C-alpha cells in the first residue's frame, strides 16, 4: 500500500484550514468611535488644509507649466534631479493627505467625501510618477487633475472658499 506524499498531505491540511476559516463567520466590525480614537485627527479641517495640503499643492502648481508675460517666457518645471525629488516628496504629502481625509474622525459621512479623498491621493500618485520620470507634460496634467479634485470638493463642502479672493480682485468701494 502506498502512503500519500507529504505535499499532498500539506495541501489537504491547508484546504481544511481554509475551509474552517471561511466557515467561522465574519470578524466583528469595530465600533467607529473606537476606531477613530486610534488616529490623531487633532488638526481641524482648516489647519489640515492650510498647514499640510495647500503648501504641498502650491509647490506642485508653482513647479509645473510656464509663464509668458511682458518679462518673457519662463518654464516652471524643476531643472535638477534634486528639484524633481523635492516636488515628488510634495506629491507624496498630497497622497497621504488624501488618506488622512478618509480617516474615521475626520471624514464626512458619505461616499462623495471618500471619492474626493481618493481622487486627491490619485492625483498625488500621478504627480509622484511624473516627477520620478521627470515627465513635464504628465506632471502638468497631474497638477490639473489635482486642481479639478480640489475645486470639485470645495464646491461640494466649502463653496465660499472659491470666492475668497473676489474682494481683492474687485474691491468694494
Q: Model features per residue range: what roles?
A:
Residues 2-12:
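Bacterial N-terminal signal peptides that target proteins for export
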Residues 24-27, 151:
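Bacterial signal peptide processing site
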Residues 17, 144-147:
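Processing junctions and N-termini across compartments
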Amino acid at each position: 500500500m502506498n502512503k500519500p506524499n507529504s505535499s499532498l498531505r500539506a495541501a489537504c491540511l491547508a484546504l481544511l484550514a481554509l475551509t474552517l476559516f471561511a466557515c467561522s463567520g465574519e470578524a466583528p466590525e469595530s465600533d467607529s468611535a473606537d476606531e477613530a480614537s486610534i488616529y490623531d485627527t487633532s488638526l481641524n479641517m482648516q489647519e489640515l488644509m492650510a498647514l499640510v495640503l495647500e503648501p504641498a499643492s502650491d509647490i506642485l502648481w508653482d513647479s509645473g507649466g510656464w509663464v509668458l508675460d511682458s518679462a518673457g517666457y519662463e518654464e516652471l518645471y524643476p531643472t535638477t534631479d534634486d528639484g524633481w525629488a523635492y516636488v515628488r516628496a510634495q506629491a507624496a504629502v498630497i497622497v497621504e493627505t488624501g488618506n488622512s481625509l478618509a480617516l474615521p474622525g475626520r471624514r464626512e459621512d458619505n461616499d462623495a467625501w471618500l471619492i474626493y479623498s481618493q481622487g486627491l491621493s490619485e492625483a498625488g500618485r500621478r504627480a509622484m510618477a511624473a516627477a520620478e520620470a521627470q515627465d513635464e507634460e504628465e506632471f502638468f496634467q497631474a497638477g490639473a487633475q489635482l486642481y479639478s479634485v480640489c475645486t470639485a470638493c470645495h464646491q461640494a463642502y466649502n463653496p465660499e472658499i472659491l470666492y475668497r479672493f473676489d474682494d481683492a480682485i474687485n474691491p468694494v468701494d
